[in-house]
């Protein structure tokens, strides 16, 4: 039969997940495997439907590009006893399946350190819903706050996270961009003294940039902006985005390698194969400084005095 791998993704409009898919597909192709991609759109019913299809579809492996929803953790573990399963960004120790983890806390700290070195003290962090279902998001924010706490100015960070319902809003495929755009507009109404705004990922940062542009606020002269993921579009915006490169494509390849190792390790039951383990990504994250961050300077002071 066809050598088939299944990839379950929550979103294919965010370039981050497309890059993961590209990494998985390139490695799978090298090994003669085809892919079946399931886009859940963060819809619990769709996720459940896809998971229940797996017993009939019988793929040789399953890769989740984010954590499964909490209500399906047991179902995923049950599946993993028959089919190799790997999860990217799993930071839930209770889920007994193979995982490729990334130190999201470290990414947050790197973002904070860059802004602190540029003299930014009053900053905002814009994020999607910070739910237990998306633990990696919270880890990134926690890392950012920890760096500011060590500098003694944690109380100078404004966290603006979207409502939880937005994760379930399937109708708007550009929801992460809208989070950045709409929460930045709210932020500008609420406070006048921030010198930098961080987006949890590049898509949110693009929304931030457009909201600032509409408000005639100069980037980075008035407000610095930073994202994370180093997606292709980070180099294509009006002002190229400062971001963090954490080698997303390679994470996809790593997850595929885990599955291949499980498949090749034994031809008998999955329980006889390699033991469950967590694979930490070995690629060191890298700060990519482009055109959207600069020193906190006089432009910001002039903007505040005008208001």
Residue ranges and their predicted role:
Residues 3-113, 117, 189-193:
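Alpha-helical recognition/docking segments in bacterial nutrient-uptake
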Residues 100-126, 142, 146, 177-186, ...:
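Hydrophobic alpha-helical segments within soluble ligand-binding/sensing domains
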Residues 122, 155-158, 219-225:
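Short acidic capping loops at alpha-helix termini that bridge into adjacent secondary structure
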Residues 111-153, 273-292:
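An alpha-beta-alpha
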Residues 185-306:
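Flexible loop/turn connectors
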Residues 8, 38, 88, 125-126, ...:
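Short hydrophobic segments within beta-strands
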Residues 28-39, 145-177:
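Short beta-strand elements in bilobed, periplasmic/extracellular small-molecule ligand-binding domains
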């Amino acid at each position: 039969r066809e050598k088939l791998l299944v990839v379950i993704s929550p979103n294919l409009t965010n370039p981050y997940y497309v890059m993961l898919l590209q990494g998985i597909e390139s490695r799978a192709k090298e090994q003669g495997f085809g892919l079946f991609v399931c886009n859940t759109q963060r819809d619990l019913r769709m996720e459940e439907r896809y998971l229940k299809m797996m017993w009939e579809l019988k793929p040789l492996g399953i890769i989740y590009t984010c954590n499964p929803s909490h209500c399906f953790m047991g179902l995923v573990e049950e599946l993993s006893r028959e089919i190799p399963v790997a999860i990217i960004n799993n930071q839930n120790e209770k889920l007994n399946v193979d995982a490729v983890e990334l130190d999201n806390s470290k990414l947050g700290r790197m973002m904070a350190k860059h802004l602190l070195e540029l003299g930014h003290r009053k900053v905002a962090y814009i994020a999607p819903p910070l739910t237990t279902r998306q633990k990696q998001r919270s880890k990134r924010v926690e890392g950012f706050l920890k760096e500011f706490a060590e500098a003694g100015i944690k109380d100078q960070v404004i966290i603006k996270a979207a409502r939880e319902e937005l994760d379930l809003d399937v109708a708007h495929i550009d929801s992460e961009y809208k989070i950045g755009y709409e929460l930045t507009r709210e932020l500008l109404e609420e406070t006048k003294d921030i010198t930098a705004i961080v987006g949890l990922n590049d898509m949110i940062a693009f929304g931030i940039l457009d909201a600032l542009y509409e408000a005639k606020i100069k980037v980075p002269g008035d407000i610095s902006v930073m994202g994370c993921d180093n997606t292709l579009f980070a180099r294509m915006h009006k002002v190229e985005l400062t971001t963090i490169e954490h080698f997303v494509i390679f994470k996809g390849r790593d997850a595929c390698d885990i599955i291949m190792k499980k498949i090749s390790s034994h031809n008998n039951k999955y329980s006889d194969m390699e033991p469950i383990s967590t694979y930490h990504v070995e690629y060191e994250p890298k700060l990519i400084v482009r055109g959207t961050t600069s020193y906190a300077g006089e432009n910001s002071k002039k903007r505040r005095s005008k208001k």
